[in-house]
Amino acid sequence: MSIKVIVAGFKGRMGSTAVEMVKGDDELTLAALLDPFAAEKEVDGVPVFTDKADLVGFDADVWVDFTIPAVAYENTHFALENGFAPVVGTTGFTEAQIQKLTDLSKDKSIGGLIAPNFAIGAILLMKFAAEASKYFPDLEIIELHHDKKKDAPSGTAVKTAELIREVRESKRQGAEDEMETLAGARGAEFDGFRIHSVRLPGLVAHQEVIFGAQGEGLTLRHDSYDRISFMSGVNLGIKEVVKRDQLVYGLEHLL
């Protein structure tokens, strides 16, 4: 049976790419599109909605969300309340929000996924970085994205940092008397190490984790040159959440 999918934020770069992915998979059916700024009533026979309240009672299985951080939590909560398994690529969630959504999914026995990054290579980078941090505890994260990205640091950088924190002995890096002569020069601090955000036109999504030790260094890097790189993960997420009974944070939990 085909999985019926709603795509929220379908007019954005990621949303429009997700629409094409769903349309190209015989196991998926594009059931509805949502965007508050949409002027059209339908696209290729698929109904378009501007208000999610109009989707109450709608016949669909999965809610794919590529909107903006300001509405992503509310959208995901709405999806769970109305029986749609959410697959969310929008970033900017707090730990408290993720916990509330996880608890709600358990109450509803509905699967779901919030993923800072859907590229398989990025997931591997996170895993490799966490493993390396056991042996190279001095590190810094540099994430680079297009200049239209609203949140910083990226969800991928935060997730990478969280995975590292789970296995790395906490320590404060740098000189004890370190002083910034220009505020923010050292980046954001997370568990004693630093995260840096770069925003430039022409970039898509890139991240490197740099490790340093006496006499040697190690650099791990992943590059997404095109948004199509995320679609294999989105596709996997859609097909997996309908089999599960609670929301997970991170695509690695479905691999």
UniProtKB/Swiss-Prot annotation:
InterPro entries: DapB_C, DapB_N, DapB_N_CS, DHDPR_bac, NAD(P)-bd_dom_sf. SUPFAM superfamilies: Glyceraldehyde-3-phosphate dehydrogenase-like, C-terminal domain (SSF55347), NAD(P)-binding Rossmann-fold domains (SSF51735). It comes from the Bacteria. It catalyses: (S)-2,3,4,5-tetrahydrodipicolinate + NAD(+) + H2O = (2S,4S)-4-hydroxy-2,3,4,5-tetrahydrodipicolinate + NADH + H(+); (S)-2,3,4,5-tetrahydrodipicolinate + NADP(+) + H2O = (2S,4S)-4-hydroxy-2,3,4,5-tetrahydrodipicolinate + NADPH + H(+). It is found in: Cytoplasm. GO terms for cellular component: cytosol. Gene3D superfamilies: Dihydrodipicolinate Reductase, domain 2, NAD(P)-binding Rossmann-like Domain. The active site is at residues 145, 149. GO terms for biological process: diaminopimelate biosynthetic process; lysine biosynthetic process via diaminopimelate. It holds the Pfam family DapB_N. Belongs to the DapB family. Catalyzes the conversion of 4-hydroxy-tetrahydrodipicolinate (HTPA) to tetrahydrodipicolinate. PANTHER family: 4-HYDROXY-TETRAHYDRODIPICOLINATE REDUCTASE 1, CHLOROPLASTIC-RELATED (PTHR20836:SF0), DIHYDRODIPICOLINATE REDUCTASE (PTHR20836). This is 4-hydroxy-tetrahydrodipicolinate reductase.
